[in-house]
Amino acid sequence: MKINNIIRAFILCLAIPLLIAEENITVDDLLKAMDANLYAKSQVYTSKMIVHGRRSSRTIEFRSWVVGIDKAFTEYLSPPREAGTKMLKNDDKLWTYSPQTDRVIQISGHMLRQSVMGSDMSYKDMMEEQPLLEMYKATLEGTEIINNRIHHVLLLEAKITGLSYQKRRAWVDAEYLLPMKEELYAKSGKLIKSTSMDGVKKIQGRWFPTRFIFRDELKRNSRGTEWIIDEIQFDLDIPDSRFSKALLRK
């Protein structure tokens, strides 16, 4: 215990020159840097979501095409019972297609609060994927050492209406400029969800996490949901036809 405290104190001492050098960096600069790492002109990726239930876990593999923050198309690849399921986001509209029923359903209203495939993520979480700087104003609460790495602690408060999370607290790695963990709060101050990320790699000039963990804090004994990026490419040219509603049935 004492050795760990000494190590943390030593790291903080080493960090002081770095923090002084960064004193002109504003919290908005931090948000811009995070957004620059997490968002791109376009993304194409293959990934899997591991949903941990109380008794067992299941893995869903899918491939996604994303342009900016307004267009996304996802096709589920496995397991067999989920294969062929598709999801399309176009601006503020979201549709899903199930090959079992051969139906296209628009997800809206209260349905947006529903879980995606039994995971700890809701459809509204997906719809609110946009740059943090556009949604929140931030204040710097301090600096913490986590896993021997320096993190800026930011409090984010909503500056637009209608967000699921009125407040967020983020621990931003000082080198990666990524929110390595977050706590998401309701307007009442109640903790609703928590997230973390790891497996950070340099991909096409940006630091990017290859594993995300989401936990619904309102679910008793929640074991969380993992989202693992197997392969990702940024800034590819994706034709508009990829985001056609007609493609859901093909």
Question: Residue ranges of each PLM-predicted region?
Answer:
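N-terminal mature ectodomain segment of secretory-pathway/periplasmic proteins
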Residues: 23-100
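Acidic/charged, solvent-exposed loop-and-adjacent secondary-structure segments enriched in E/D, K/R, S/T
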Residues: 99-127
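Generic beta-strand structural signal
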Residues: 66-67, 88-90, 97, 140, ...
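Gly/Pro-enriched, hydrophobic low-complexity segments
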Residues: 103, 107, 127, 147-245
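A short, amphipathic edge element
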Residues: 27-28, 127-139, 189-194
